[in-house]
């Protein structure tokens, strides 16, 4: 990729969420930013014309793109990033918004002050005001408003340096749904990255109740398929087998309880059929570095 100009490209991917998108764009009208910035909006093959939402927003720095097919969240984000002009990529879900007008100011400042890090996680809250899908462990809850190194981020609200994003090949679009965040961090560590920098001073409201997750058979399929794939291609061979046995049995028990054995078998089968793109496998030392990021 060509060198990027100084600034922020805010990437939004939407699909059939006109009202959510309208609200998100409305919140961006008062956003403060200390550098040039743009909004890249990707319509991921919605059933209706989403361009009218963009026109109605009146946002002059918004650029609209539409894909001809549903690329899934990781593919849609990759497409949006490929259109970006600036060196810092910030991703936000279409049903989310920053809490506070100075979020981009904080992001820009943090990324400038932490040159050793490429991936930045934010604090994500739900409609009740609680934390949304806090992945960093209970021991870090007292530091939710502070900073720390971690191995997790939520793709619905995070930032990454464009140069590093493309050095990693972006998100693994072949996953289509679920697990792309973990996969990106594993690729980053495999190539010598420093993990993820969490900045709790940047807050995102994900406009859902609770953790917003509904246990359904479709999600279960992608969990089985993608986790088995990620473990196989990212972890050292022997350790990969141990992890796959553990999760294989875990998902099997779940499938038996829920009556989803057919879906379980299909997920296992399809995990072996996902095409590989590039090779970023952790060494044993980098796997240990990944594990230490949870402590």
Give residue spans per PLM region.
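A conserved acidic beta->alpha catalytic loop
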Residues: 27, 43-52, 96-97
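Glycine-rich, basic loop-to-helix element that forms the pyrophosphate-binding segment
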Residues: 67-84
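Conserved donor NDP-sugar-binding/catalytic core segment of glycosyltransferases
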Residues: 101-132
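Short, acidic, metal-binding catalytic loop of nucleotide-sugar glycosyltransferases
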Residues: 26-36
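Non-catalytic, C-terminal membrane-associated alpha-helical segments of glycosyltransferases
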Residues: 222-223, 237-295
